[in-house]
Amino acid sequence: MVQLNQNFINTIAQELPAHLSMDDFIAACSRPLRRSIRVNTLKISSEDFKQLMQPKGWTFDPIPWCEDGFWISYDEEEQLGNALEHIQGLFYIQEASSMLPPTALFTPNADWQCVLDLASAPGSKTTQMAALMNNQGLLVANEYSASRVKVLHANVLRMGASHCALTHFDGRVFGEYLYESFDAVLIDAPCGGEGIVRKDADALKSWSLDEVLEISETQKALIESAFLALKPGGSLVYSTCTLNRHENQGVCEYLQQTYGDAVQFESLNQLFDGAEKATTPEGFLHVWPQIYDSEGFFVAKLTKTRSVPRLQPEPKLQKNFPFTEASAKQAKAIQAYFADDLGIELPDDLIMVRDDEFWLFPHEFRDFIGKMRFQRIGVKLADHSKHGFKVRHEAIIALAGKALTAATNGAKVVDVSDEQAKEYLMGRDIPLDTAGKAQGEVIVCYGGAPLGMAKHLGNKLKNSLPRDLVKDKVLLLPPQA
């Protein structure tokens, strides 16, 4: 049973728009959320995904503000996170409202090449933006919590987002270290979480205005840092999953009061059909749960019209960056290995070397070398030894998708059944029905997307899945009559 703190109710009652009723708000907060997912178009089109899942009893109701987002219904009560297609990275379990901020940032004419996600974990919006960028340009994804950085990296890897650079800092440092470096910035700020009560019945049990005001001070510092990191002419989207004015309009107004006409609010009134139902006088989206039968959410978009002075002197460049650009000989060798042994043509990105490791970085990352420490950049391609190259799992997940549709071009692909895919993801070797000639390293594929690597020994596939990715449980969604 949802518990709404009376102080919260009293406060929200004063802020609820006149055309909405408090009874409807409380009723909406008491209803379970509709299940929603976003198709990962880095691996599969929405149409192909629907064709894949409809025989398994899924029905799809389009989310109006996300082309690849759907409310779904199906009969199974199992946890979707264990589904084979989820482990494979074909979809992300994401609440519908949380798909709004990337949609607001990536309007149809946006061509952002360098983007910052200031508070990224667990990665729903990061991977949504990676798909909108089609793994082009550079997406810097920051997360302050050390434990959540690991979750972020796992989701980036699972979804095949290859052009990300992960950082682990307090978001308040970006305006200093990466001043006016980004075409676009998303800040989905840490907040009081008033909008998620449908998912967490106790979210508002101990609500207090003092805590709200304290959080809003942190949010003001974060949005100012994000604004300083934004290039002139760039766009910033600020969002929260909370409902009070202090953490939403108040934070945006603070930024405009601080930087004057350098801050230009952009109306989101026409972002999607029906957006006007949630649009505030300033042009922000204030999504109350009863409007779209979703979580509560707030989204604001602004343009930085001119440069503003930096608050701190420019930091000195950091030394001892551990990567060097591959020589022409090294680059040719790794490209030949991927093409000849795996049937994968490496994209025209920056091939970097660290000791015996080969990595693929976005070209745009060059401008960031020495400015900040990064936890993880791009994709690790392979390790090199006297025996040759050994491909990395993450490279296959991020880069093999296009090769799998054209095995005749030389891609070494073994298609497996759903039962075999389950066995593979649980770390087991796969017996082959008929013995044949050993083929060495092959890409294991299910349903047109890669699962990972195996060694073809003629009579079986020897599993090469990294131990930390082995699953205890894999759910096969059964066909429905």
Curated annotation (Swiss-Prot):
The gene is rsmF. Specifically methylates the cytosine at position 1407 (m5C1407) of 16S rRNA. Belongs to the class I-like SAM-binding methyltransferase superfamily. RsmB/NOP family. GO terms for molecular function: RNA binding; rRNA (cytosine-C5-)-methyltransferase activity. Its main location: cytoplasm. The lineage of its organism: Bacteria, Pseudomonadati, Pseudomonadota, Gammaproteobacteria, Alteromonadales. It is found in: Cytoplasm. Pfam families: Methyltr_RsmB-F (PF01189), Methyltr_RsmF_N (PF17125), Methyltranf_PUA (PF13636), YebU_pre-PUA_dom (PF21150). S-adenosyl-L-methionine binds at residues 119-125, 143, 170, 188. It catalyses: cytidine(1407) in 16S rRNA + S-adenosyl-L-methionine = 5-methylcytidine(1407) in 16S rRNA + S-adenosyl-L-homocysteine + H(+). It comes from Shewanella sp. (strain MR-4). The keyword RNA-binding applies. GO terms for cellular component: cytoplasm. It comes from the Bacteria. Keywords: Cytoplasm, Methyltransferase, RNA-binding, rRNA processing, S-adenosyl-L-methionine, Transferase. This is Ribosomal RNA small subunit methyltransferase F. Its EC number is 2.1.1.178. The keyword Methyltransferase applies. The active site is at 241 (nucleophile). GO terms for biological process: rRNA base methylation.
